[in-house]
Amino acid sequence: MSIEIPAGLTELLQGFTVEVLRHQPADLLEFALQHFTRLQQENERKGAARFGHEGRTWGDAGAAAGGGTPSKGVNFAEEPMRSDSENGEEEEAAEAGAFNAPVINRFTRRASVCAEAYNPDEEEDDAESRIIHPKTDDQRNRLQEACKDILLFKNLDPEQMSQVLDAMFEKLVKEGEHVIDQGDDGDNFYVIDRGTFDIYVKCDGVGRCVGNYDNRGSFGELALMYNTPRAATITATSPGALWGLDRVTFRRIIVKNNAKKRKMYESFIESLPFLKSLEVSERLKVVDVIGTKVYNDGEQIIAQGDSADSFFIVESGEVRITMKRKGKSDIEENGAVEIARCLRGQYFGELALVTNKPRAASAHAIGTVKCLAMDVQAFERLLGPCMEIMKRNIATYEEQLVALFGTNMDIVEPTA
């Protein structure tokens, strides 16, 4: 069955996506409602303008013939210009209590959003040297605090985040100094450490202030993600300090490391016996919904008897699998016996997802452990077609339980 994409849908969604990336709204649904409502209102105004123009022509003719009053159309030329500011992670000012919807420049066609081709595999790790700008402990702590809520960095693992912090350099600015200028090529992404800044957008050659930053926020990442000129001028209105990240380092850390991580996840998925029947496209979907979790030494990952909500693949570290036997005591204080250990690339927790039964065993971290996790909803949505194949492995697990405990039902029942 072929599905025809309605005309204009792609451009509509692309425009909305860019606005979300620029403004990073806390309430995405409210932002979407305001965004599309505004678009609808603008279309209605344009229709009214066309109707008004036709009405004015008819009215002028009527006035010439019979002295009638000319009808009035909509005069957009008298309306103030509204425009976007370049705002990747704009934070609300301390006194602001509500989210303000972004404004759109209705007179300028949206510029193309594109980027030069970039292949992370073309760079060799051996040829790269890690960029480090020395920082004091206080500077590093302030920088880490400033970066913790930036969307671009939320999915970075601790090692990648450490690389970002090392590579960021401090830029001191004076009052009145231009940090970036509208139309210039984007070279750096900036995080505000301290200071106030105004956002200016040129309209008919005249710059107009459309917003400001007050000791927090970030800007410039759109120019690093896409090959597009700066959309605004940022001017310091007080002495301040910024942390900058250059284009090359940004692309290497964010893009290349994510590409390497994705390949690693794909290799993990390919190695799982119960997923071997999946097509390549299906495996890629699995990779898209996988999340990562880090556990400290001795921390419980899953508990025997709990309801199953996800299964895990060990990315790094070692996991200890234990099981309690009903009515029997063991040498361990908690009455559990160790039945297995999982290392890098091995998985656990999938049996409960197949059988819809409570967890049959517990898992604890040995040292620091990083796991890939897929929740049960995504599991059922994506892996439904291969459930029967997965169930073929149940016999193997039941044989292991029988060998260990004499029966495959000899586990502690979950307590209410």
Curated annotation (Swiss-Prot):
Positions with a binding annotation for 3',5'-cyclic AMP 1: 152-273
GO biological process terms held by the UniProt record: adenylate cyclase-activating G protein-coupled receptor signaling pathway; fatty acid metabolic process; learning; modulation of chemical synaptic transmission; negative regulation of cAMP/PKA signal transduction; response to antipsychotic drug
Location in or out of the cell: Cytoplasm; Cell membrane
Modified residues (Phosphoserine): 83, 85, 112
Stretch list, region Dimerization and phosphorylation: 2-151
Molecular-function GO terms, alphabetical: cAMP binding; cAMP-dependent protein kinase inhibitor activity; cAMP-dependent protein kinase regulator activity; protein domain specific binding; protein kinase A catalytic subunit binding; protein kinase binding; ubiquitin protein ligase binding
Membership in a protein family: Belongs to the cAMP-dependent kinase regulatory chain family.
Name assigned to this protein: cAMP-dependent protein kinase type II-beta regulatory subunit
Organism: Rattus norvegicus (Rat)
Gene name as annotated: Prkar2b
